[in-house]
Amino acid sequence: MDPVTLAVLKGRLEQIADEMDATLFRSAFNPIIAEAHDASHGLYDPVSGETLVQGKSGLPVFVGAMAFAVKAVIDKTAESGGVQPGETWIFNDPYEGGTHLSDFKLVRPFYFEGTLLSLIHI
């Protein structure tokens, strides 16, 4: 891939994550999320669980924990054939990417034309 295409794709992925942040913060009823921005978002590799891109407006403390949460979903679903279209995993287990009980994780697959492209973490 040439450097220009790579830069364009990188910028687009960053914009997607930033728009995820903005949408949640704008629509949140809870002032802790709406005003303090106590959340983070990211796109993750569906095989390894590694971070592809993350939003810039959320709290940095979640960024490290989010990859562990995504990896936990990948590991839990491996026996049943992996994450399937339409599934959403929501949990607050502090041993699987958690920080404390009031922080929950939401992981959902992103498919395009039947191909799993990434896992979305909110």
Each predicted region: which residue ranges?
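A charged amphipathic helix-loop-strand protein-protein interaction module that recurs
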Residues: A17, P60-P94
